[in-house]
Amino acid sequence: MLLSKKFLVRSLMVLFVLLGILAYGQIDYTISSTIINKHSIWAEFFNMFGEVPAMFGLLLGTTILYGLRNKKVMWKNILYSIIGLFFMLQSSFMICFMPIKYIFEFSKDGVPQGFKILSCVLAAIVFVSSVIIVNRISQEKLREFKKIAIVFILLVVLEILIVNILKVVWGRPRMRSIESIEQFKYWYQISGPAASNEFMSFPSGHTANGFVILAYSMFLPYFKKIKPNLFISFALTWGGLVALSRVVLGAHFLSDVLVGGYITILVFYTLNHIFIKDKNNEGFSGKKRRVV
């Protein structure tokens, strides 16, 4: 499924309006400080698992490209296998370790050794399963997913890169790090370079990673039983809850999550338009694609 230009323009207009409102007075600070609840169970759930769609998308993309490696030329097969397996293993580890890392985010001793071992074991299971599954899928079927794999990889890499560059440049203190309105910085105030992670509030990386779930809409032409609008509603709800959870936990202001989410939407739309969409609104496999 493709996000339409109309959707992009409308969402951009909403973003600008909201950022304009949040730039006035103490609205951004007031809203964020009002809903903060550092002990919220549901917010902690999305704090732990909100970024999984991005890491799993990275695993999905690298696994598909690994399955499409050139097996006829030995040196290419060996080289691409090493590169592919390395990134598959890394993605598998991130999927399993990130939720555990956030459990002990503020622990003085960090992640206990037992949990580190557990994450490695789980990562090994995910990694081996990925290798087995991709080797059972035909080359013809994998070729259908090649451009989707490229979009996933570029989307995750680009949104993480853009977000982290902005974080360092902006140097905005997190909600949990300030004690009064006097220490508050508006979203448009550039105070970088960031001295530490506590000054990397703008924009929200969690939210950007959470909205990567929208990219799974590219698989909808292959799963006819899933209603497109229902999936998009679910994806936007997931991204929205990830965003809200970051504000509730005091990790971000409302303006941080708005920009973080839109970065992913914009990058996804651009990549989707370049790699997937054609004049007839068909996918790269020739299957008709629906637009929302």
Where is each model-derived feature located?
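Hydrophobic, lipid-facing residues on alpha-helical transmembrane segments of integral membrane proteins
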Residues: 57, 87-91, 125, 153-165, ...
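N-terminal transmembrane-helix/juxtamembrane module of multi-pass inner/ER membrane proteins
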Residues: 2-123, 170, 174-175, 180, ...
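Membrane-interface loop-to-helix entry segments
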Residues: 42-57, 107-125, 194-222, 254, ...
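Membrane-interface loops
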Residues: 27-34, 94-106, 137-226, 232, ...
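Membrane-interfacial, low-structure loops and terminal tails that flank and connect transmembrane helices
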Residues: 1-4, 75-79, 136-147, 282-292
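Membrane-embedded catalytic cores of phosphoryl/pyrophosphoryl-handling enzymes
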Residues: 2-15, 187-292
